A protein has these predicted regions:
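Polar/charged low-complexity regulatory segments
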Residues: 1-137
Length: 137
């Protein structure tokens, strides 16, 4: 994850917060920034097998986080992707609950709201994240 991406998405998340009035605890907001920065230039983020099979074959916290993050990214950035948005939300929530920490239990509980917020960050912000990449870092 590049620092420049983190800086861009920190600004985007701040703008979305101001526009929507949605305020998350700081650790959730940081998680959204990190998630977007981590996925921005990845083209191989989808599971190798189906989402359902990936859920059934979670081996550890890392694979649970990867699947949860993928579902959160897909539902926020590509809300019309695939079968049904609620399918990916359900799988993402289930993956995050397998980690059983306060952070991931919170992300799981508020998954649809966080996903909608990510959608605003990427598609509905007055500040277009793509324009921010034109900055000379």
């Amino acid at each position: 994850m590049q620092d420049a991406y983190v800086a861009v998405f920190r600004d985007v998340v701040s703008t979305a917060r101001e526009q929507t009035g949605i305020e998350f605890p700081l650790h959730i907001e940081h998680y959204v920034v990190a998630l977007l920065a981590e996925h921005v230039d990845r083209s191989d983020f989808l599971p190798k097998s189906s989402f359902a099979e990936s859920l059934l074959t979670i081996k550890n916290s890392r694979t649970a986080k990867e699947l949860g993050d993928t579902c959160l990214f897909v539902t926020g950035v590509f809300p019309n992707y695939g079968i049904d948005r609620n399918y990916y939300i359900s799988i993402g929530q289930s993956a995050y609950t397998r980690i059983d920490t306060e952070l991931f239990n919170t992300v799981s509980a508020y998954f649809p709201t966080i996903s909608d917020f990510i959608n605003v960050c990427v598609h509905g912000c007055e500040t277009d994240p793509i324009q921010l990449y034109d900055y000379d870092w």
